[in-house]
Amino acid sequence: MSKVSGGGPCSRRRDGVDPALRSRARRRALQAVYAWQISGGVAKQVIAHFAHEQAYEVADLVYFEDLVEGVLTHCAELDEKLTPYLDRTIEEVDAIERAVLRLGAYELLYRQDVPYRVVINEAIMTAKRFGSKYGHTYVNGVLDRAALALRKVEVLG
C-alpha cells in the first residue's frame, strides 16, 4: 500500500512535485531563516547546517535550498514589497512571523509555479504551528494583500 503523505508515489502531482515534501521543506526553511535573522550568520553556513539536518528528514532539499538562498539573497527587496501591507516596521514584526512573511513574499515573487493560494495557505499553517497565538491571522492579512499586488492577474483571474 502506498503512503499518501510524506513521499509516496500517490502523493505526487502530475508535475512530479510532492506537496508533503514541499511543506516539510518550507518548515525547515522557516527554521533556517529564523536562525539567520537571530544570529546574522553567513547564508552559506546557515544553508549548510540546515541542509545537513534536512538529509535526515524526508523533504524537498532542492526547494529548501531555493527558499533559504532566495530569502537571504533578496531580503531587502522582500521587506520593501511587504512594507506597504505592514502596520509596523518589519523589524517590529515577531521574528517567526517575519520569517514566514519573507518566505511567502519570496514564493509570491519568484516561484510563479506555486499558486498564490498555496503560498498563503502554507504560510498560515506554518505560522499556526510555530508562531504566536494570532500570528497566522496577521500573516494571512499581509500576504493576502501582497498577493493582490504581486500577482494581480492570478488573484483576480
Swiss-Prot record:
Coiled coil stretches, renumbered: none
InterPro entries per record: NusB-like_sf, NusB_fam, NusB_RsmB_TIM44
Domain of life of the source: Bacteria
GO biological process: DNA-templated transcription termination; transcription antitermination
Molecular function per GO: RNA binding
Keyword Transcription regulation on entry: yes
Keywords noted in UniProt: RNA-binding, Transcription, Transcription antitermination, Transcription regulation
Similarity remark: Belongs to the NusB family.
Annotated function: Involved in transcription antitermination. Required for transcription of ribosomal RNA (rRNA) genes. Binds specifically to the boxA antiterminator sequence of the ribosomal RNA (rrn) operons.
Name recorded for this polypeptide: Transcription antitermination protein NusB
Gene designation per UniProt: nusB
